C-alpha cells in the first residue's frame, strides 16, 4: 500500500502544481489573492506569504485528540460512552459506530507520534482516559499501572520530539462505575472522586506535564448529556426523548454544570496548593460559538445577547465573579443552584489559562417562553439558534449538514473574551473541519481542500485578533491529528489531517492535502503551490493580497 500511496501523493503534487499555475495565469496576478478579511470566498495558495512566522516565536502550533475517540477499549475499564453507545447504538452514529476499537492508539501510539513529527507541530493536546488509570473510578479501588505506563511512554515520546503535552483530565468519558453508583456529575460525590483522580495524575505525570486541562467543554455534558440525551450518559425528560433512561431536562443540566464547576475549581486549588512547585499551568476548556442577530430588530439583538450569556457566561461568570449571569438567575429562577461564599471564592480566578474551542457561528432570534411542563435548559435563554438569517443567508461556507462556518467569528470570540473576562491567557484548543467519512480509500480522502480553506481563514482572523486587538493567545491546536470516532457521528465524518484506515488501523497514517498544507505552514517559507488550491469560488473574479 505504501509504495502506491507515495506514487499517488507525488502525482497529486504535480497535478496540484499544474492547477496552481493555471489559476495564476488564467485569472490573476500572484499578488492579487483573496484576503482573509473577506467573509467568502478565501484562498490560501502560498504559505511563503502566510505562515507561522506571522505569529510570535513562542506561539505553540499543535494538533488535538481525545482518549475515547482514538485509543480503543483495550486495557481500560468501561466508561459512560461505552455504556451509551451499546445501550443506544443508533445514537453513536448513523453507522452505529462506537469507540470500541477506533484507531487503537493504545497499541499504535508510536504512529501518532510519527505523524506529529512529520507535521512539525510543537504541541499535542490529548486526554487521559479516567477508567484506564482507575478502572473502577476510585483511587481506593485500585490503580492500573499499565495505564500509567502507557501515558508515561506517550508523554516521554512527545518530549523526546520537542512536542509539548497538553493533557485533558476529563473529556466526557466518566468511568461507568461512578455513573452507576451515583449518576456521576449529578451528585457532589464526584468532586472528591475527580480530585483524587487528578491528584494521582499530578503525582505521576506532573514532572513532565506543564499544561493541564481540567474539563473539556463545560457546556457539553450538561446540555447534550442531560438535557437532550444525545450524548452520554443519555438522560433527559421523557417528552424530549422517550429513549432516555431517566432525567429532567429542566433541572439536571444545571446541577451537572454546577458540580462540574466545583470539581474544576477544587482540582485547580489542589494543583496550586500542593503541586505549584511543578511549575505548570491549569485551566478549563470552553466550547465557543459566535452569535449574530437573526435580523435587525431589537428582539433579535437582545436574543443574541442572551445566547452569549447562556452559552458562554453560564461558566465564565462563575469563573470570574463567583456567580451565574443575572439573566440566567432571572429566567431560570430556583432551578439554578447557588454558590455559597466559600464556593464563590474557590471559583473566582480558578484558571491560569482558558482553552477555547471554536467551530461555527449561529444566528439568534427571540423565542417565546415554554409552558411549565416543557421547560428545558435548551430554551431557557428565550433565544432560538439557527444557521440561516431572516433572508435565508448563512454566515459563511458550509461546515456540516445544516451548519456553516464564519472565520470572522474567531476574531469576535477572542475579542469578546478579552474585553468581557479580563484579558485571559488563551489557547485555541480545537478548531477543525469535517469531510465525508465511511470506508473511503486514501485516494478519495486526500482531496480535503475545504479543510485547507477552513484552517487558513480561521488562522488569518486569529492573527488579526492577536496583532490588532492584542488578545493574549499563545497556541492553536487543529482538530484533529487523524481521522477518529466522532461523538454521535461514528465514522461517517473525518476530521483528520492524516488518514486512518479503520479496516487496517496498524497501517501508516498518511497526510491528506490539509496535513501537507499545515506542514508547509509550519515550515515558515516553503512555497506550497504544488499541493494547494482554493475550493471556494472567487468573488467576481477579483483577488487581493493577504495583509
Curated annotation (Swiss-Prot):
Biological processes, Gene Ontology terms: abscisic acid-activated signaling pathway; carbohydrate metabolic process; defense response to insect; glucosinolate catabolic process; regulation of stomatal movement; response to abscisic acid
Alphabetical list of InterPro entries matching this protein: Glyco_hydro_1 (IPR001360), Glyco_hydro_1_AS (IPR018120), Glyco_hydro_1_N_CS (IPR033132), Glycoside_hydrolase_SF (IPR017853)
Known EC number: 3.2.1.147
PROSITE patterns the record matches: GLYCOSYL_HYDROL_F1_1, GLYCOSYL_HYDROL_F1_2
Active site: 430
Keyword terms, alphabetized: Abscisic acid signaling pathway, Disulfide bond, Glycoprotein, Glycosidase, Hydrolase, Plant defense, Signal
Glycosylation sites: 340, 384, 504
Organism domain of life: Eukaryota
Its job: May degrade glucosinolates (glucose residue linked by a thioglucoside bound to an amino acid derivative) to glucose, sulfate and any of the products: thiocyanates, isothiocyanates, nitriles, epithionitriles or oxazolidine-2-thiones. These toxic degradation products can deter insect herbivores. Seems to function in abscisic acid (ABA) and methyl jasmonate (MeJA) signaling in guard cells. Functionally redundant with TGG1.
Listed name of the protein: Myrosinase 2
Source organism: Arabidopsis thaliana
Gene for this chain: TGG2
Amino acid at each position: 500500500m505504501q509504495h502506491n500511496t507515495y506514487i499517488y501523493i507525488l502525482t497529486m503534487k504535480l497535478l496540484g502544481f499544474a492547477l496552481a499555475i493555471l489559476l495564476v495565469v488564467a485569472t490573476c496576478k500572484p499578488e492579487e489573492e483573496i484576503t482573509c478579511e473577506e467573509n467568502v470566498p478565501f484562498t490560501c495558495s502560498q504559505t511563503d506569504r502566510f505562515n507561522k512566522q506571522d505569529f510570535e516565536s513562542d506561539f505553540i502550533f499543535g494538533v488535538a485528540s481525545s482518549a475515547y475517540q482514538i485509543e480503543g477499549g483495550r486495557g481500560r475499564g468501561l466508561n459512560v460512552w461505552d455504556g451509551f453507545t451499546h445501550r443506544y447504538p443508533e445514537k453513536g452514529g448513523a453507522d452505529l459506530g462506537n469507540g470500541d476499537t477506533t484507531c487503537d492508539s493504545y497499541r499504535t501510539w508510536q504512529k501518532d507520534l510519527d505523524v506529529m513529527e512529520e507535521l512539525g507541530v510543537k504541541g499535542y493536546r490529548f486526554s487521559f482516559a479516567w477508567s484506564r488509570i482507575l478502572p473502577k473510578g476510585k483511587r481506593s479501588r485500585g490503580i492500573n499501572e499499565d495505564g500509567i505506563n502507557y501515558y508515561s511512554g506517550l508523554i516521554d515520546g512527545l518530549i523526546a520530539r520537542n512536542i509539548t503535552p497538553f493533557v485533558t483530565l476529563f473529556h466526557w468519558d466518566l468511568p461507568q462505575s461512578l455513573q452507576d453508583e451515583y449518576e456521576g456529575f449529578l451528585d457532589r460525590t464526584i468532586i472528591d472522586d475527580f480530585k483524587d483522580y487528578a491528584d494521582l495524575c499530578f503525582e505521576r505525570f506532573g514532572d513532565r506535564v506543564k499544561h493541564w486541562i481540567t474539563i473539556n467543554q463545560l457546556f457539553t455534558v450538561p446540555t447534550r448529556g442531560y438535557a437532550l440525551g444525545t450524548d452520554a450518559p443519555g438522560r433527559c425528560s421523557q417528552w424530549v426523548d422517550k429513549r432516555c433512561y431517566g432525567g429532567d431536562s429542566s433541572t439536571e443540566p444545571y446541577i451537572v454544570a454546577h458540580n462540574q464547576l466545583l470539581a474544576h475549581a477544587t482540582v485547580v486549588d489542589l494543583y496550586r496548593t500542593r503541586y505549584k512547585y511543578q511549575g505548570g499551568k491549569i485551566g478549563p476548556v470552553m466550547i465557543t460559538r459566535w452569535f449574530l442577530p437573526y435580523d435587525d430588530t431589537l428582539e433579535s439583538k437582545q436574543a443574541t445577547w442572551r445566547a452569549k450569556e447562556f452559552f458562554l457566561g453560564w461558566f465564565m461568570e462563575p469563573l470570574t465573579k463567583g456567580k451565574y449571569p443575572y439573566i440566567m438567575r432571572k429566567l431560570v429562577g430556583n432551578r439554578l443552584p447557588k454558590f455559597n461564599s466559600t464556593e464563590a471564592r474557590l471559583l473566582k480566578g480558578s484558571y491560569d489559562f482558558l482553552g477555547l474551542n471554536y467551530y461555527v457561528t449561529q444566528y439568534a432570534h427571540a423565542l417565546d417562553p415554554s409552558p411549565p411542563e416543557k421547560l428545558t435548559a435548551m430554551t431557557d435563554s428565550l433565544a432560538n439558534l439557527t444557521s440561516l438569517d431572516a433572508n435565508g443567508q448563512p454566515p459563511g461556507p458550509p461546515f456540516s449538514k445544516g451548519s456553516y462556518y464564519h472565520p470572522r467569528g474567531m476574531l469576535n470570540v477572542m475579542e469578546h473574551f478579552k474585553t468581557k473576562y479580563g484579558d485571559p491567557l488563551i489557547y485555541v484548543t480545537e478548531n477543525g473541519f469535517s469531510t465525508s467519512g465511511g470506508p473511503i480509500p486514501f485516494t478519495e480522502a486526500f482531496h480535503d481542500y475545504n479543510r485547507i480553506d477552513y484552517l487558513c481563514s480561521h488562522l488569518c482572523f486569529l492573527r488579526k485578533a492577536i496583532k490588532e486587538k492584542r488578545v493574549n493567545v499563545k497556541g492553536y491546536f487543529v482538530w484533529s491529528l487523524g481521522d477518529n470516532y466522532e461523538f454521535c457521528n461514528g465514522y461517517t465524518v473525518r476530521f483528520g489531517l492524516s488518514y486512518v484506515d479503520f479496516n487496517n488501523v496498524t497501517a501508516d497514517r498518511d497526510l491528506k492535502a490539509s496535513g501537507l498544507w499545515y506542514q508547509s505552514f509550519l515550515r515558515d517559507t516553503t512555497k506550497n503551490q504544488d499541493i494547494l488550491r482554493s475550493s471556494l469560488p472567487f468573488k467576481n473574479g477579483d483577488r487581493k493580497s493577504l495583509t
